[in-house]
C-alpha cells in the first residue's frame, strides 16, 4: 500500500492547487459513472421498529392467535404428508423422469388445497393479480423480490411448480418429503459439477414441451429487504425459453416477514407474523416475456431486461449486489468490521475490474488491518496516522483524493477495491516494459540517465517541476539504468506500472470518464516512440 500511495500520488500531483508545494489536482481520469455508489447501499438489512402500543397489541393477540395458528400449521403439515408419500414413494430422490400421471391426479389437488390452507391458517390475506401462464406459454416463473421464507406462497398460487433447492433440504424429515413431491431441481454444494448439472436439468425440463411441471426460480438467489432488485442469476434465462415474471408485495404497516442477513431470525419472524391479526400479500403475474434472438445467445442480457421490467412495475431501483456480497458481509463481521463494510456490488466490481471473489476477499483482509481500529470501519486520513498507510502528509492526502470517490473524507471498502484495481493494477507485461524503456531512453544508447528519466516522466504527467530523483535512485545502481535493471525493478514493483506507462495509457480517460465529460489529455513530450507504436500498445483496450 505504501508503494501504491507513492505511485498514485506522483500521478496525481500538479502545481498550484494549494496543497503543499506541488498541490493536488483531480484524478487524471474523471470518475466513471458506472462506479457511482448504488441507490440502495445495503439491501440485506432490515430494522423493524415496533412501538410500545403495537407491542401490547401483539401480546394480547398472540395469547390467542399464536398457539392456535401454530397448531393449525402443524395439522396441515401432517395432513399433507400422506399425499407427499404417495407422490414420492418408490421414486429416486433425483428424478430422471416426471412423476406419473396417476400420482399427480391423486396428490396435486390435495396439496394445492392444503398449501392455501396453511398460509390462511398463518393469517395471510392473499391478493392475486394477472393470469398464470400455461407450461407451454412459459415453462419458467421468475419471482422477485425474494425477501422471506413466506415467499413460498407464490409457489402455491402458481399451482405448485417445481423449485430449485439445496440437496440438503430434501433430506429434512417431513418438509423434505413435501419438497420432493414438487419434483425439485436439487443443487449439491459438494459436487463440483453441480452448477453445470443444475443448468442442464433446468434446460431439459424447460424444453420438454409440458412433460415436466413448470419451474419456479428466485433469480436473486438470496433474500433482500425489497428496497431494490439485486442482480438476477442467469440460470433461469439460459434455456432461452419464455418466462413469466411474478411480483411479490407485502403492503403492511408493520413488516414482520422480511428475513435478511441483518435482522430478525426465522423463529422471531414466525412469532411476530402469527401475532398479527392478518398479513397482506400481493402476487402479480406479469405478461410472459419471450427472449429475442440476441437474448437467447446472451442470457445475462435477457435477465437484465426482465429485471428492469419488474423493477419498473415495482417502482424500485436495481443494484448490482449479489449473494457474494452476503459472503463478504459475513467475512467483514468475522474481521470485527461492521457487516455492511463488505458490500461492494460484487457483480459490477468483478465484471469491470476483472476481480474474482477470492481476490476481493483478500483485499478485505488488507482493508480490515487498516480500518479495524477506525470508527465505523472506514479509513480516514487522520485515523490512519501512524498505521500501515503512514502519517498524514501531502502524499497521503493525494492518495485519499484518488481513493475517496464521493469526497466524504473517508474510504470505504468499495472505494478501496476500486482504487487498488484502477490505480495499482499491475500492467507490466514484458512488451509494455520494453516500450516503456524505449520511451525513457531518448538517445537510444541502451541506458536511461536521470535527466532522460525526469524529462519524460515530468512531460508525460504534465508536471514540469515534479521531483522524481528519489524514484530514479531506487531503480539505478549507478548513474544510469540498464534494461535489465529497469525490467527487474518493474517486475518486483508492479505498482509503478501506471507511472512507467502513463504516456501510453492516456487514452484510458475514455474508459473511466462520462461521455460528456471526456477532456482532452494534456500534451506530452514526444520522442522516438512512434505514433504507430502507441496505437499498437493501446488498440486492444476496450472502451466501456
Swiss-Prot record:
* Taxonomic source organism: Rattus norvegicus (Rat)
Protein localization: Endoplasmic reticulum membrane; Golgi apparatus membrane; Cell membrane; Lipid droplet
Q: What does its UniProt record remark on the domains?
A: The HXXXXD motif is essential for acyltransferase activity.
Per its record, what are the GO molecular function terms?
Answer: 1-acylglycerol-3-phosphate O-acyltransferase activity; 1-acylglycerophosphocholine O-acyltransferase activity; 1-alkylglycerophosphocholine O-acetyltransferase activity; calcium ion binding; lysophosphatidic acid acyltransferase activity; plasmalogen synthase activity
What Gene3D superfamilies does the record tag this protein with? EF-hand
State the name under which the record lists this protein: Lysophosphatidylcholine acyltransferase 2
Q: Which Pfam families match?
A: Acyltransferase, EF-hand_7
Chain ranges of the EF-hand domain: 391-426, 428-463
Q: What is its EC number?
A: 2.3.1.23, 2.3.1.51, 2.3.1.25, 2.3.1.67
Compositional bias of kind Polar residues: 520-530
Positions in the Lumenal compartment: 80-544
What are the Basic and acidic residues biased-composition ranges?
Answer: 531-544
User: What InterPro entries does the annotation carry?
Assistant: EF-hand-dom_pair (IPR011992), EF_Hand_1_Ca_BS (IPR018247), EF_hand_dom (IPR002048), LPCAT1-like (IPR045252), Plipid/glycerol_acylTrfase (IPR002123)
The keyword Heme is annotated on this UniProt entry = no
Keywords, ordered alphabetically: Acyltransferase, Calcium, Cell membrane, Endoplasmic reticulum, Golgi apparatus, Lipid biosynthesis, Lipid droplet, Lipid metabolism, Membrane, Metal-binding, Phospholipid biosynthesis, Phospholipid metabolism, Repeat, Signal-anchor, Transferase, Transmembrane, Transmembrane helix
